[in-house]
Amino acid sequence: MSLSGRVAFVTGASQGIGRTCALRLAKEGAAVAVAARNQEKLTELVAEITNAGGKAAAFALDVADEEQVKSAIKAAIAQFGKVDILVNNAGITRDQLVMRMKRADWDAVLQTNLTSAYLCIQQVIPSMLKQRWGRIINITSIFGQMGQAGQANYAASKAGLIGLTMAIAREVGSRNITCNAVAPGFIETAMTAVLSDEFKQNAVKQIPLGRVGSPDDVAAAVVFLASDDASYITGHVLNVNGGMLMG
């Protein structure tokens, strides 16, 4: 699944799933523009990619800030000539029961997890339309499909990404641009590392494959959807959850 000659823009790339996606895309030959808030971690990631012979550039930004997104994608296109692949991975949690949830925490999660995807898609589509080729991949979540108590904001944002994915797939499909989502289940990341051992053990009991997933499992799905092998797949939600949710 060579991605040689392709250019990817990955948000939430400083750690976890986003970082692993960037590394895998670069390994397959894509030039990678990595975006997140943490400049130091982005610089380390770019160094790792370039030291391995790849091409990469870092863009420290707030993905929910429209002007910062415009500036970063414009700069990425100026540097690499285009953006072929967009991976909307940026995500945060602000967990609380809905009756106690602060409006600021609702807004922050929706802005980072959902609005940022809309902003990035809007900025990369002209480049993709021009070349009549594009791959938009939104990282949603199993909780956007089945809900989760205490995560009304997170679940709503991830469910919104699924609806956005299908709408964009219909809008741009005629120009050879696909838009798909990847829905991870329980993945070992910094976001899940803070959970109690008891919670993790109970979660694993619900997974037919009997293990927690890794960022590499998600990145493999992203690389596939970014490749020519997935050229006839669009508007699809690819579950990467070990069987925790089926159907």
Language-model region placement:
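Residue(s) in the substrate-gating loop at a strand-loop-helix junction
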Residues: S141
